[in-house]
């Protein structure tokens, strides 16, 4: 009688398994060794953490050496077709933000979910057989209905427009219909298609939007605008439209030719005096860059204008040393620039504590992609919001914020500076440095403190920027 009951129970169990779980390919017993984890065992056996826990009646992920686990290897028959709901979605090498980024896939891309991990991440197949891991909250069962303009920059001014739902409502001519060849005037607004001055850049491994902006002598914001990019993330093989500048907008390196103009205002004797006064200048690099911006807005900090910044201090504090040949014009111009630098330094010192205080107000708030605050944030939305509270305007994306700041070393970094990270496809994360190797940032787990050299951060650290 007991044998009969056992047979019936076993048969029922098999029936339930057949309908409630993936098909079992094979079963085996694994003896846990030191250093083993459920996730590691699941990966090596082609199953999932949840499947192992269910098969062994485990309520936690804790296992001990010598423990025997029944592992059912599952066949990958049950696969779900899903669509990317985010504008761009990072594909990582493992299930979590601690793993490196393999690439980014565009919103609306269809993917196949192979497995689901206990933390909500999915292993997916995309682009004809490539695999990786994504956060499951950015996948949906329905294809996104957001119309996407797919444009190709060629030698002739042709463009390919996706379905007719992409209404060209921004065309200035009232009578213009939604026909493909019509809106030539609108192409100046739709920046991705540019005239004869346009070229197409094929993204290669190691490319970043910042590097491309320097290479082509255009701004990060222009490249993002021309290609309808909402973030600075780009991927290998992506085609980017680059408009060659019609005016001579020289790259930063070429602006060295403007240096003699700054030197005309400063006699050689003043240069020597300013060097003697270097020890009293605590922020020589910052002051130099601010003054250079006043003289030549498109160039980075150059050595030539630096003496004029310190000249005013030399003339004011040590007239005996400056007795050789200071000119009145030098004092006048230097005074203007020195005042600007002094005010900027005072603003930075005064606003640092206010920035940190504002950032701390939002600790614990939730992360959301594209969140601008005040209830949810993404990383660059958080920094932009906090700085705006102190009257400082930042660009919207982490890449653009990186491009707009002055690069400084970690030894120079102070609370209130920005700290940047690159997961492999360009600047893709930013936080507010608070000192002692710590930052406040908006990441997948919300607004929180993080150690910039800790696990998941240190190997992606790019450097620091000062606003």
Curated annotation (Swiss-Prot):
Residues 154-199, 247-348 are annotated as: Disordered. Residues 330-343 are annotated as: 7 X 2 AA tandem repeats of T-N. InterPro entries: LysM_dom, LysM_dom_sf, NLP_P60_dom, Papain-like_cys_pep_sf, Peptidase_C40, SH3-like_bac-type. Residues 1-27 form the signal peptide. Its EC number is 3.4.-.-. It comes from the Bacteria. Pfam families: LysM, NLPC_P60, SH3_3. The active site is at residues 379, 429, 441. Keywords: Hydrolase, Protease, Repeat, Signal, Thiol protease. Residues 349-467 form the NlpC/P60 domain. Residues 172-185, 288-348 have a biased composition (Low complexity). Residues 79-143 form the SH3b domain. GO terms for biological process: proteolysis. GO terms for molecular function: cysteine-type peptidase activity. Residues 28-71, 199-242 form the LysM domain. Belongs to the peptidase C40 family. This major extracellular protein may be involved in the invasion of non-professional phagocytic cells by Listeria. LysM domains are thought to be involved in peptidoglycan binding. This is Probable endopeptidase p60. The lineage of its organism: Bacteria, Bacillati, Bacillota, Bacilli, Bacillales.
């Amino acid at each position: 009688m007991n044998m009969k009951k056992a047979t019936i129970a076993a048969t029922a169990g098999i029936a339930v398994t057949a309908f409630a779980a993936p098909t079992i390919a094979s079963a085996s017993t694994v003896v846990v060794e030191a250093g083993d984890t459920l996730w590691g065992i699941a990966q090596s056996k082609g199953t999932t953490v949840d499947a192992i826990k269910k098969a062994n009646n485990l309520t936690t992920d804790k296992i001990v050496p010598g423990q025997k686990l029944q592992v059912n290897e599952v066949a990958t028959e049950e696969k779900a077709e899903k669509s990317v709901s985010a504008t761009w979605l990072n594909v990582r090498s493992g299930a979590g933000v601690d793993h490196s980024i393999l690439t980014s896939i565009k919103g609306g891309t269809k993917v196949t979910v192979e497995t689901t991990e206990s933390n909500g991440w999915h292993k997916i197949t995309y682009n004809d057989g490539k695999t990786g891991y994504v956060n499951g909250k950015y996948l949906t069962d329905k294809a996104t209905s957001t119309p996407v303009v797919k444009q190709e920059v060629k030698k002739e001014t042709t463009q390919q427009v996706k379905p007719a739902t992409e209404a060209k409502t921004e065309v200035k001519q009232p009578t213009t219909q939604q026909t493909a060849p019509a809106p030539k005037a609108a192409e100046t607004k739709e920046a991705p298609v540019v005239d004869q001055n346009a070229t197409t850049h094929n993204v290669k491994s190691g490319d970043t939007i910042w590097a491309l902006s320097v290479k082509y002598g255009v701004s990060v914001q222009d490249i993002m605008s021309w290609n309808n990019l909402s973030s600075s993330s780009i991927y290998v093989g992506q085609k980017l439209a680059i408009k060659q500048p019609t005016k001579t907008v020289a790259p930063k390196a070429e602006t060295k030719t403007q240096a003699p103009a700054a030197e005309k205002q400063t006699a050689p004797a003043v240069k020597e005096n300013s060097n003697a006064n270097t020890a009293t200048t605590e922020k020589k690099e910052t002051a130099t860059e601010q003054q250079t911006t006043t003289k030549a807005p498109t160039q980075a900090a150059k050595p030539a204008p630096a003496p004029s910044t310190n000249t005013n201090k030399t003339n004011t504090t040590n007239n005996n040393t400056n007795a050789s040949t200071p000119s009145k014009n030098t004092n006048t111009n230097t005074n203007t620039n020195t005042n600007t630098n002094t005010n900027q330094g005072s603003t930075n010192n005064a606003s640092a504590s206010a920035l940190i205080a504002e950032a701390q107000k939002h600790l614990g708030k939730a992360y959301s992609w594209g969140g601008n605050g005040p209830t949810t944030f993404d990383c660059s939305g958080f920094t932009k919001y906090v700085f705006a509270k102190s009257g400082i305007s930042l660009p919207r994306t982490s890449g653009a914020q990186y491009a707009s700041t002055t690069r400084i070393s970690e030894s120079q970094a102070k609370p209130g500076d920005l700290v940047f990270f690159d997961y492999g496809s360009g600047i893709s994360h930013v936080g507010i440095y608070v000192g002692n190797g710590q930052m406040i940032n908006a990441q997948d787990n919300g607004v929180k403190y993080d150690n910039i050299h800790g696990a998941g951060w240190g190997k992606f650290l790019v450097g620091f920027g000062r606003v």
